[in-house]
Amino acid sequence: MSKVFVIILVALMVAISIASAHRPPPNPRCLPGHSKCKYEPKKNSCCLGFQCTERNQCELVYPGHHGKPCGKDNLLGCILPPPTFKPRPCGKYNLKGCKPIRPRPHPHH
């Protein structure tokens, strides 16, 4: 029983190594910090999953749950804070889905 399992495992590893050897080399624009790009707001000259920052470099974007808040440096591939969640203070990086916080009256001593 265990010998069959080992043979299947080895066959899988060999198949994976052959498949990965035929993959084309990664696009230099897909490597964070290595590729130069022209920064243009709302445009993306980098490959999918990357974005061009103001430093004219392609930076990795984390999609979905791990997305960075939207802001000056992150127009593409960013997530807006959900408005149903805790209200967050308005700021440079949080223009949508935020609520202005009213100053609380301090109790007098």
From Swiss-Prot:
Query: Which keywords are on file for this protein?
Result: Disulfide bond, Knottin, Secreted, Signal
Q: Which cysteines are joined by disulfide bonds?
A: C30-C47, C37-C52, C46-C58, C70-C90, C78-C98
CC terms in the record's Gene Ontology section? extracellular region
Predominant location of this chain? secreted
Localisation per UniProt entry: Secreted
Q: Does the keyword Signal apply?
A: yes
Q: Where is the signal peptide?
A: 1-21
> Would the keyword Signal turn up in this protein's UniProt record?
yes
Summary of the tissues where the protein is detected: Expressed by the venom gland.
Per the record, the domain comment is: The presence of a 'disulfide through disulfide knot' structurally defines this protein as a knottin.
Q: What is this protein called?
A: Cysteine-rich venom protein 7
